């Protein structure tokens, strides 16, 4: 169906689709929506590298695929290495990489394949300065293998190897600040994004496309299956993660920080509003919630100071 021109003028999200219906994601999957936005932003002239993760399955079983772009499946820990090699090979053959008329080399990996098992390859990619974009879709656990904790799993969360109940083995470590590790490499561009704010996400994808050198985006992508949440609440949960400052939106560009919160002067909502929609937090005690709230507000104040000093 043709989209009316008056609607096109009001919407900044591209209308073209390169991620099609019929894929095998769970209902309410945040990762599949995020991947759809990536392909809307970059189009068919994209080489997408996906390691072992949910998105490998979502893309479709051979010989079918829901993705209308070049797709390279690779081993769990190798995303950073593979996008480095593809970018180097394209340049050696004389192709333009990055830019609006260049080939986009994109790594698309989960938090387990990035923050944990793939951290070494990610660091090498960043340090060498390759012209590619690495996107970590953050659903805060190893969802494809059975909802095991990752270093991106938040304090107080239930997973299959941090179970709740009477023995109370919930996750007792705070979420790893992967974006800080990335920024420590002094790359030109890094950002956080959320599926609840698609225009902000696509703007950041477009900026990463234009900037020479490596770019990194950490995308908050709820998993209703692993988070024990209603499938129709993924966007609301993602929005509350931002509104509570649990997952603030910001950019780091050439040494400068910029906060992208929808209402930057508004005080964050209580963390309980984010937690109560998810069954993975149902075992948290009052003290657990207070501990997480304290950490969230401390990290939020730290980010505001960084933006103030290095903005």
Swiss-Prot record:
Catalytic activity annotation: 3-methyl-2-oxobutanoate + 2 oxidized [2Fe-2S]-[ferredoxin] + CoA = 2-methylpropanoyl-CoA + 2 reduced [2Fe-2S]-[ferredoxin] + CO2 + H(+)
Enzyme class: oxidoreductase
Glycosyltransferase among keywords: no
Domain of life: Archaea
Any Pfam family: TPP_enzyme_C
UniProt EC number: 1.2.7.7
GO terms classed as biological process: organic acid metabolic process; sulfur compound biosynthetic process
Alphabetical UniProt keywords: Oxidoreductase
GO molecular function: 3-methyl-2-oxobutanoate dehydrogenase (ferredoxin) activity; thiamine pyrophosphate binding
Subunit-structure text: Heterotetramer of one alpha, one beta, one delta and one gamma chain.
Protein name, UniProt field: Ketoisovalerate oxidoreductase subunit VorB
């Amino acid at each position: 169906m043709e989209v009316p021109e008056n609607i096109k003028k009001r919407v900044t999200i591209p209308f073209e689709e390169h991620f099609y219906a019929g894929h095998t994601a769970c209902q309410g999957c945040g990762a599949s929506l995020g991947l759809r936005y990536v392909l809307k932003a970059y189009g068919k002239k994209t080489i997408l590298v996906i390691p072992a993760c949910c998105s490998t399955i979502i893309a479709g079983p051979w010989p079918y695929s829901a993705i209308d772009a070049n797709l390279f499946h690779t081993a769990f820990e190798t995303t950073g290495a593979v996008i480095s090699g593809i970018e180097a090979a394209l340049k050696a053959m004389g192709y333009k990489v990055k830019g609006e008329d260049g080939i986009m080399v994109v790594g698309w990996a989960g938090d387990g394949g990035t923050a944990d098992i793939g951290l070494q390859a990610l660091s090498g990619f960043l340090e060498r300065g390759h012209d590619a974009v690495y996107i970590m879709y953050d659903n805060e656990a190893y969802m494809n293998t059975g909802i095991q904790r990752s270093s991106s799993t938040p304090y107080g969360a239930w997973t299959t190897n941090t179970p709740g109940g009477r023995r109370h083995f919930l996750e007792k470590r705070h979420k790893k600040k992967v974006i800080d590790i990335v920024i420590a490499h002094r790359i030109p561009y890094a950002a956080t994004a959320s599926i609840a704010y698609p225009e902000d996400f696509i703007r950041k994808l477009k900026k990463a496309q234009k900037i020479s050198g490596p770019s990194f985006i950490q995308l908050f992508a709820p998993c209703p299956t692993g988070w024990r949440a209603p499938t129709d609440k993924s966007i609301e949960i993602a929005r509350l993660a931002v509104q509570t400052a649990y997952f603030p939106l910001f950019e780091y560009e050439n040494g400068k920080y910029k906060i992208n919160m929808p209402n930057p002067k508004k005080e964050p909502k209580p963390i309980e509003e984010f937690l109560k929609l998810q069954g993975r937090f149902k075992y948290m005690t009052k003290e657990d919630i207070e501990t997480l709230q304290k950490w969230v507000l401390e990290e939020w104040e730290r980010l505001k100071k960084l933006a103030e000093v290095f903005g």
